[in-house]
Amino acid sequence: MLRTHLSGELRKENAGQSVTLTGWVNRRRDHGGVIFIDLRDRTGIAQVVFRNEDVAERAHALRSEFVLRVTGVVEERPEGSQNPNLASGDIEVSVTEFEVLNESAPLPFQIEDSSSAGEVGEETRLKYRYLDLRRPVQANALRLRSAANKAARTVLDSHDFTEIETPTLTRSTPEGARDFLVPARLRPGTFYALPQSPQLFKQLLQVAGMERYYQIARCYRDEDFRADRQPEFTQLDVEMSFVDQDDVIALGEEIISEVWKLIGYEIKTPIPRMTYADAMRRYGSDKPDLRFDIEITECTEFFQDTTFRVFKNEYVGAVVMTGGASQPRRQLDAWQEWAKQRGAKGLAYILVGEDGELSGPVAKNITDAERAGIAAHVGAQPGDCIFFAAGDTKSSRALLGAARGEIAKKLDLIKEGDWAFTWIVDAPMFEPAADATASGDVALGNSKWTAVHHAFTSPKPEFLDNFDTNPGDALAYAYDIVCNGNEIGGGSIRIHQRDVQERVFEVMGITGEEAREKFGFLLDAFAFGAPPHGGIAFGWDRIVSLLGGFDSIRDVIAFPKSGGGIDPLTDAPAAITPQQRKEAGIDAKPKPKAEAQAEAQAEESAEK
C-alpha cells in the first residue's frame, strides 16, 4: 500500500507516530511561510503542515485536487487551534517528505466549498460527475446506498432467499411503458428489449421451484420525461412461493425496518394499512403523506340541493387551512394560479372570520342554510380558510390532495426527521385505458380496460369468478408501501393458473394469438404445476434518496441521466455510423420465424 494510515482515522492516540498518508489537496493555506493543507481521502480530512524549509518551499506549488503522498509525524495541535468540525481535529501531521502523485487542471467548480454546491448547475455537476463525487455529501450517498444493499441482503439471506440474476436481453413484452430496444446483429431485423422489470423471469423461477428469490435489479423504461425519473433505475426485487399477502408484507416490513436503522430510526411495526378507496377519499392520493393531519371532507351530499352552479357537480370536496383567513388577496390569487397550473379552473374558497362570519366568492353564492352549516361540516374554526374543488371525482380529489400538501408546507407542518409509513391495499384491478394514457402510462392491450398494476396481478379471491364480467368493480390482490408521500415499493399475489391469466388478457383486449406470441412461454409454464406465489419490488433509488435526505434520486445514482435521458458526462445517447447501422441490421427485414429457427439449428449442428 502507498499509505500506512487513513486521514480521517487519525486521533490523539496516534501522536508521535510516523505515518504516510495519500489523498487530494482539499484546501491550502499559507501562514507566514508555513503551508497548511487539508488532505482528503475517503475517510475524511487530516491537516498536514509543511514547516521544514525544504518541503515548505516545494509545497508552494501545490494546488487544489493535486494528489499527494505525504510522510510525517503525528502531533497534537497547540491549545486553541483544535478543529471540532473534524474527526481528526485534535492532531496534525508535520510533514518530513512528500510526493506529488498527480496534478490537477483548474477546476470547473470548487470541491471543498460545499456552500457553493447549490450555485453549480446540475448539467455541469453531471458532466464532471467524477469531481462532484469527491464531495463528501455525494460520496457518502453512494456509501449509504451500499450499506442499504447490505442490510437488505442480510435480511433476505436470513430467510434463506437465493440471489439470482435474470436476463437483461430479452424479448419485448408489454409492461406499462415503452421498451428500450437492442438490435440483434446475428438475426438482422430482430431486436432484444431491455427489461422494464424482472417480473416474468422471477415468476418463472417460482415455477422452477426456487421458492425464494431476490435480486438488486436494473430496470429500463423508455418513458417521456417526468421530473425525477430515470430511464434506467434499480429495484430490490423479491418473489416467494406458497405465501399470502400478509407473508409478503411482513417480510417487506422487516427489510424496510432494517434499512431505516442505518439512519438511527426505528420503524414501528406492523405498519398501518389503508384501503385504496380510503386513501383517495381522505387524502386524494394513493400515496398519501401522513406526517400531517389534514384530511379531505366530502361535501357532495351537503351541497346536493345547492343553487351555486359551480357546486352542481359529480363531486364537491374541501380541505381546511388553519389560520388561512388572514392570507392577503395576492396570496389567495396565487392559489388560483397554483390550481390552474395543475389543470384546474381554480380553487374556490371561503374565509371564516374571527367572528365566525363567512366571506369570499363562494360565501356570496351559497344559500343561508349552507352558510350556516359549512364551517361545522368541514371542521373549520374562526380564522380558517376552506378550499373547495368541484367536478369529476378523480381530478377534484387529486387537486385537494395536492392542496393539503401545499398547505402543510406553508404552515410548516412537516418536521425534519418525521417518518410516516402506510400500506395501501385493495386497489382496483383495472382502470379505464384512457385514464392510464392521460397519466402518461402505456395502456396495455386493445380494450377500454387496462391493468392498474400489471397484467400478472391476481384478483382478490372474492373477485376470482367475476372480475372479467365486472372489471370496474374487481379489486387486485396488491399492496403498495408509502413513505412520506412517496411510493417506495409495491407488489402483489400473482396469477399462477393459465386460465385466469388468459381471462385477464381478454379483459385487456389481448387476443389469444397475441397472448401466445408475447407471453406463450409464461402460459406454457403455468401448465406444469406453477405454485401460488407473490412478491414485492422496492424502488431502491427512491428509498436511498429518502434515507439520505436528498430531493432527487439523481444524487444517489453514481452516473445518472439528466432531463430527457441525456448523460452529460458521455454525451449519450449518440448517433451511430452508417457502418454500425448496417451491421446491426436495424433496417433489415426479419426472416420468417421458422426459417430463422432452422438456420439456428443448422449452425448449432455445424458447431458440434
UniProtKB/Swiss-Prot annotation:
GO CC annotations on file: cytoplasm
GO BP, one annotated term: aspartyl-tRNA aminoacylation
Binding sites annotated in the UniProt record for ATP: 221-223, 230, 487, 539-542
Enzyme Commission numbers on file: 6.1.1.23
Region entry Disordered, spans: 566-608
PROSITE patterns tied to this protein: AA_TRNA_LIGASE_II
Residues the entry annotates as binding L-aspartate: 175, 221, 453, 494
MF (Gene Ontology): aspartate-tRNA ligase activity; aspartate-tRNA(Asn) ligase activity; ATP binding; nucleic acid binding
Classification via InterPro entries: Aa-tRNA-synt_II, aa-tRNA-synth_II, aa-tRNA-synth_II/BPL/LPL, Asp-tRNA-ligase_1, Asp-tRNA-ligase_1_N, Asp/Asn-tRNA-synth_IIb, AspRS_core, GAD-like_sf
Cellular localisation: Cytoplasm
Stretches the record annotates as Aspartate: 199-202
Catalytic activity line of the entry: tRNA(Asx) + L-aspartate + ATP = L-aspartyl-tRNA(Asx) + AMP + diphosphate
Record's keyword terms, sorted: Aminoacyl-tRNA synthetase, ATP-binding, Cytoplasm, Ligase, Nucleotide-binding, Protein biosynthesis
Sites annotated Important for tRNA non-discrimination: 31, 80
HAMAP family: Asp_tRNA_synth_type1
Role: Aspartyl-tRNA synthetase with relaxed tRNA specificity since it is able to aspartylate not only its cognate tRNA(Asp) but also tRNA(Asn). Reaction proceeds in two steps: L-aspartate is first activated by ATP to form Asp-AMP and then transferred to the acceptor end of tRNA(Asp/Asn).
Summary of subunit composition and partner proteins: Homodimer.
Family: Belongs to the class-II aminoacyl-tRNA synthetase family. Type 1 subfamily.
Stated name of the protein: Aspartate--tRNA(Asp/Asn) ligase
Organism of this sequence: Corynebacterium glutamicum (strain R)
